[in-house]
């Protein structure tokens, strides 16, 4: 439920949000919110609906029941896609383009003005010197870092991160936490799914636990 003591509406809120597949419930109904400067850590066993929840919020799946609000107003599917940056299990990269070409291509594709230059984003995620490397030549961990660079370039205030620590070593996990912290300090927010014990983004973090449907 939305806290009535909030002086401003949450950045994102869900009311009685639920989703079913083949008439079988996947999650919900759920009521939750996330404020600017806050991370919501979504936990649950495999099959609890963590990935599905993020895909519904991102507008990749239809809202079957319930309501999604942005800044206190009901959000249409197109509104959500502009407001949120989604990082899923698949990096969504062009294998035959270089790392730098991928970042330029994706920024142009979405009509977004990057908050930093793509080359700087590569350096931030530890891929300096890989500007001309083709994506198909990268390891799984390097591809995840490139996807993180794309996320960093997005001006979207809300990050939806599905298992962002997967395929990363301890250095990469620390990188993700630093990125989340910087995003929150800048007034953004994040929803992060994980089942890893090590995955604990810093700063303001609350928990949402999903139970697998019976």
Curated annotation (Swiss-Prot):
Residues involved in ATP binding: 44-51
Family: Belongs to the ABC transporter superfamily. CcmA exporter (TC 3.A.1.107) family.
Record's protein name: Cytochrome c biogenesis ATP-binding export protein CcmA
Annotated organism of origin: Xanthomonas campestris pv. campestris (strain ATCC 33913 / DSM 3586 / NCPPB 528 / LMG 568 / P 25)
Signal peptide stretch: none
Role noted for this protein: Part of the ABC transporter complex CcmAB involved in the biogenesis of c-type cytochromes; once thought to export heme, this seems not to be the case, but its exact role is uncertain. Responsible for energy coupling to the transport system.
PANTHER family the UniProt entry points to: ABC TRANSPORTER I FAMILY MEMBER 1
Gene: ccmA
Documented EC number(s): 7.6.2.5
């Amino acid at each position: 439920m939305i806290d009535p003591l909030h002086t401003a509406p949450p950045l994102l809120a869900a009311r009685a949000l639920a989703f079913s597949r083949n008439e079988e419930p996947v999650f919900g109904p759920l009521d939750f919110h996330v404020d600017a400067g806050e991370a919501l850590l979504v936990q649950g066993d495999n099959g609890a609906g963590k990935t599905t929840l993020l895909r519904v919020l991102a507008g990749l799946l239809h809202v079957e029941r319930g309501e999604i609000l942005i800044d206190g107003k009901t959000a249409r599917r197109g509104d959500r896609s502009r407001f949120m940056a989604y990082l899923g299990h698949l990096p969504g990269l062009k294998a035959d383009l270089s790392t730098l070409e991928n970042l330029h291509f994706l920024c142009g594709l979405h009509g977004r003005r990057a908050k930093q230059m793509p080359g700087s984003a590569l350096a931030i995620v530890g891929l300096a010197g890989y500007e001309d490397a083709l994506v198909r030549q990268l390891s799984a961990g390097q591809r995840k870092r490139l996807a993180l660079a794309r996320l960093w370039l997005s001006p979207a205030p809300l990050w939806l991160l599905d298992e962002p620590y997967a395929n990363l070593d301890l250095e990469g996990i620390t990188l993700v936490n630093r990125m989340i912290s910087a995003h929150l300090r800048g007034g953004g927010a994040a929803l992060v799914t994980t089942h890893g014990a090590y995955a604990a983004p810093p700063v303001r973090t609350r928990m949402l636990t999903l139970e697998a449907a019976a």
